[in-house]
């Protein structure tokens, strides 16, 4: 190998320099120079190979001067950093001057190294030549590398480490292209396979297997072909068409598909369908196969028949449960079982259309009579639990001895029983009769009746008989009596509640006066003795609290003195059978308690608390009233006249004047019976205006013995709100009317006795003439004139104070009403602070007590 160096430092080689790598010593790399132009040195060539083409570490050992050895040492770190290139030797010669030029050329013009290109030929040679125009090919290789062929570099590195340089890169370059060409269509095929697998056709086929849409269309074909199955399934279809189970109960599809699939190999979908098994069983039972035919059935059909039997055994304890769920699912469970079709038909045969159902059954099973006989034997075993669930009468009987699980089912069971309804009506009549007794007595009797007749009573609500009645009542059970009293009021006996507010008192008295009452002789003889009046039919008014437990008497005196002695003819009108009870303080009761009390008296619920209190007070007074009045009518003569008693025998030892004046304010009927009185007796009745012209005449015409009892329960006046009479009006100062104007037949007096408030007696007037104190208080406050200013300060009226939400002192308002307020409106009654507090609470007026200034009074009303 010879080298030539020119004068300018260039080196020319005219021979071939073999390059022998250590990895493959047999192979040889030949570098041919096509021309004698300036070419790079071997070291620069190795650098070029390490950076561009040969990407492996090489080790070069040159034979030459020290400068050439330094060149190798300088290029070694570049070569050793490359990947998998070891012990590569480059043999050649060079001069010192050339080495300096070569380093300079490599550093100054690195593009010259890029001008040489490695041509790979079919042989094991590497030919280096100057090919500057072929730089585009290198760019195309770079662009190919940039296109994403990252595996090209990886495969080149691996192949050059193990194989020859000349042959392996060609195969490895083509290999990744083939891999890329093969992997991409493989990936596309896989994606296409996935796309084909995600189509919804297979899913819809799976859906058609379990959805009942196909089953509903196929039974039409089997109904035409198979007559016995059509009859039986028509009955089942009529029963359960409204539920989802009806779609699974059609046996037409199973009759054909089940027989065909049982002959062949059973598939997985057929074993997973409980519908087919049930329908095969139904087809067998409906067709009426005999015992021999059933024994000849295949094992698949026997296994199919065993499954419904297991379900049948599981459903037996469910049929015994008397719950709402069992009621709702009873008919569906019966229809699902083919064995239970006959008992259902027998139950339906009791209805009017039993002949038609029987005809259908016989026509549908005309060729399967022995099979039906066997089915009836099996049905008799299962009949009692099904009969208890389905048949309502048996279920009602079973409820008596069972502990019910749900309260609602017990309500449905016993709520519509006719016997229970009659029993409730009977107890309502008994409770109505007990309503005429006093409050405590009626409550005790009603509780006893409820516990005796209805079992557990109204408070516990443990019995099923009381659940419907307890739904519309309070905890004490008083509201039920209200409803039943309203419904059965036309069947009630005449009582205090039979007094209608618009009916005349004379009409009611003709039917309600007991036969023991003595009649008055028309020939001016003495009166016959009057027996005691029955408290339930003649209600009396209570006395004031100071007269508790005292029996009072009125002395009845004949109008005209005759052969009978007046002193010996004093007769007691009536005497109560029991002492007067303590009057409860209704203001201290809660609203619920007041509602219960009102319901116990037979009235409808009232929203206003004040109205309930006033109504209860009137009812209590009418019940516990002492017989201090004379009966007003005889069975044929009408009203009897009584006279004022003398000083020695006028009143009982315990009767106080205040009680007499309090009776003067009793309530009177709403409608005047003046027409009847004038027709039967022909006596004119004094008008209201003539009796209320002056206060003096009103005060003088009070007669306690002539006060008539009012039996109306719905008058507006409140018995509790009537205050005791003023001490300046004692009963001794009262003088009776003249007796000369009355006829001798003891009919209505020509000039009736009047009470202190100026009203005519209850036989002539109505309760409208005596308004309630609440309305009178309101009228008096609004009628107050505007006051004059005092020292330049305006004095507001009571009405203006109420409008300005000023606290109203109850004592001051009571004094003003009793002195000035009632006189302006012509009212003689008096009020007290307790009544005014109730009025303020009903009207929403802020009120205070004088002693508790600045605080609202919430304490209950306590009366002395």
Curated annotation (Swiss-Prot):
Residues 1-21, 49-69, 91-113, 161-190, 289-318, 346-385, 413-433, 625-767 are annotated as: Disordered. GO terms for cellular component: Slx1-Slx4 complex. InterPro entries: Slx4_ascomycetes, Structure-sp_endonuc_su_Slx4. Residues 307-318 have a biased composition (Basic residues). The keyword Coiled coil does not apply. It comes from the Eukaryota. GO terms for molecular function: 5'-flap endonuclease activity. It is found in: Nucleus. The keyword Transcription regulation does not apply. Phosphorylated in response to DNA damage. It holds the Pfam family Slx4. Keywords: DNA damage, DNA recombination, DNA repair, Nucleus, Phosphoprotein. Residues 685-695 have a biased composition (Low complexity). GO terms for biological process: DNA recombination; DNA repair; DNA replication. Residues 295-306, 656-668, 743-767 have a biased composition (Polar residues). Belongs to the SLX4 family. Regulatory subunit of the SLX1-SLX4 structure-specific endonuclease that resolves DNA secondary structures generated during DNA repair and recombination. Has endonuclease activity towards branched DNA substrates, introducing single-strand cuts in duplex DNA close to junctions with ss-DNA. Forms a heterodimer with SLX1. This is Structure-specific endonuclease subunit SLX4. It comes from Paracoccidioides lutzii (strain ATCC MYA-826 / Pb01).
């Amino acid at each position: 190998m010879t080298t030539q160096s020119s004068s300018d430092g260039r080196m020319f080689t005219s021979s071939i320099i073999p390059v022998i790598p250590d990895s493959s010593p047999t192979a040889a790399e030949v570098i041919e120079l096509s021309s004698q132009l300036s070419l790079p040195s071997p070291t620069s060539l190795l650098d070029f190979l390490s950076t561009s083409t040969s990407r492996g570490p090489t080790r070069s050992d040159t034979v030459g001067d020290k400068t050439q050895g330094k060149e190798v040492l300088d290029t070694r770190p570049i070569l050793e950093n490359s990947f998998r290139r070891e012990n590569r030797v480059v043999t050649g010669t060079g001069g010192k001057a050339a080495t300096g030029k070569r380093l300079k050329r490599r550093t100054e013009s690195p593009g010259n190294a890029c001008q040489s290109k490695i041509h790979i030929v079919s042989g094991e040679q590497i030919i280096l030549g100057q090919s500057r125009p072929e730089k585009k090919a290198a760019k195309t290789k770079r662009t190919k590398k940039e296109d994403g062929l990252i595996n090209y570099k990886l495969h080149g590195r691996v192949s050059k480490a193990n194989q020859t340089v000349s042959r392996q890169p060609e195969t490895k370059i083509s290999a990744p292209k083939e891999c890329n060409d093969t992997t991409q269509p493989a990936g596309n095929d896989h994606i296409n396979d996935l796309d084909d697998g995600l189509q919804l056709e297979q899913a819809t086929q799976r859906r058609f297997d379990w959805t009942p849409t196909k089953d509903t269309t196929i039974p039409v074909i089997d109904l035409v072909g198979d007559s016995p199955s059509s009859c039986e399934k028509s009955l089942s279809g009529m029963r359960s068409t409204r539920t989802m189970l009806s779609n699974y109960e059609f046996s037409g599809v199973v009759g054909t598909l089940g027989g065909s699939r049982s002959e062949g190999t059973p598939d997985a979908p057929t074993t997973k369908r409980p519908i087919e098994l049930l329908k095969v069983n139904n087809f067998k039972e409906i067709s009426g196969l005999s015992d021999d035919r059933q024994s000849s059935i295949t094992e698949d059909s026997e296994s199919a028949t065993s499954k419904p039997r297991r379900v049948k055994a599981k459903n037996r304890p469910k049929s015994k449960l008397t719950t709402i769920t069992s009621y709702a699912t009873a008919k569906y469970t019966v229809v699902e079982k083919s064995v239970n079709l006959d008992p259902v038909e027998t139950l339906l045969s009791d209805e009017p259309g039993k002949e038609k159902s029987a005809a259908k059954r016989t026509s549908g099973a005309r060729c399967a009579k022995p099979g039906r006989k066997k089915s009836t034997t099996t049905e008799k075993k299962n009949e009692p639990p099904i009969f208890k669930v389905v048949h309502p009468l048996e279920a009602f009987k079973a409820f008596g001895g069972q502990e019910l699980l749900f309260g609602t089912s017990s309500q449905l069971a016993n709520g519509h029983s006719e016997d229970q309804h009659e029993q409730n009506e009977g107890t309502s009549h008994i409770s109505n009769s007990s309503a005429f007794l006093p409050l405590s007595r009626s409550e005790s009797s009603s509780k006893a009746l409820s516990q005796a007749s209805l079992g557990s009573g109204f408070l516990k609500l443990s019995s099923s008989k009381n659940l419907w009645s307890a739904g519309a009542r309070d905890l004490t059970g008083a509201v039920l009596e209200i409803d039943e009293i309203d419904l059965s009021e036309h069947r009630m006996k005449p009582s205090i509640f039979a007094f209608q507010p618009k009916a005349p008192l004379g009409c009611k008295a003709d039917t309600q006066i007991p036969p023991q009452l003595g009649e008055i002789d028309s020939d001016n003889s003495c009166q016959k003795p009057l027996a005691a009046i029955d408290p339930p039919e003649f209600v009396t008014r209570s006395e004031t609290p100071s007269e508790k437990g005292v029996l009072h008497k009125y002395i009845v005196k004949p109008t005209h003195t005759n052969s009978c002695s007046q002193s010996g003819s004093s007769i007691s009108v009536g005497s109560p059978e029991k002492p007067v009870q303590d009057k409860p303080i209704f203001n201290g009761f809660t609203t619920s308690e007041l509602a219960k009390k009102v319901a116990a008296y037979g009235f409808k619920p009232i929203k206003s608390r004040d109205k309930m209190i006033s109504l209860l007070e009137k009812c209590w007074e009418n019940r516990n009233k002492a017989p201090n009045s004379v009966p007003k009518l005889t069975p044929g003569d009408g009203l009897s006249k009584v006279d004022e008693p003398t000083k020695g025998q006028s009143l009982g030892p315990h009767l106080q004047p205040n009680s007499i004046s309090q009776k003067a304010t009793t309530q009177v009927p709403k409608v005047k019976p003046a027409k009847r009185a004038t027709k039967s007796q022909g006596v004119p009745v004094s008008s209201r205006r003539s009796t209320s012209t002056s206060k003096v005449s009103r005060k003088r015409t009070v007669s306690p013995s002539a006060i008539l009892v009012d039996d109306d329960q719905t008058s507006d006046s409140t018995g509790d709100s009537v205050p005791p009479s003023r001490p300046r009006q004692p009963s001794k100062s009262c003088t009776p009317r003249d007796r000369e104007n009355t006829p001798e037949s003891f009919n209505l007096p020509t000039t009736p006795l009047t009470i202190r408030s100026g009203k005519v007696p209850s036989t002539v007037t109505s309760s409208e003439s005596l308004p309630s104190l609440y309305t009178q208080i309101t009228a008096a406050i609004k009628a107050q004139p505007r006051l004059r200013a005092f020292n330049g300060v305006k004095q507001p009226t009571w009405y203006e104070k109420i409008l300005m939400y000023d606290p109203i002192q109850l004592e001051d308002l009571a004094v003003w009403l009793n002195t000035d307020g009632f006189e302006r409106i012509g009212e003689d009654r008096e009020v007290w602070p307790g009544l005014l507090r109730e009025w303020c609470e009903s009207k929403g007026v802020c009120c205070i007590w004088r002693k508790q200034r600045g605080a609202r009074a919430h304490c209950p009303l306590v009366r002395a």
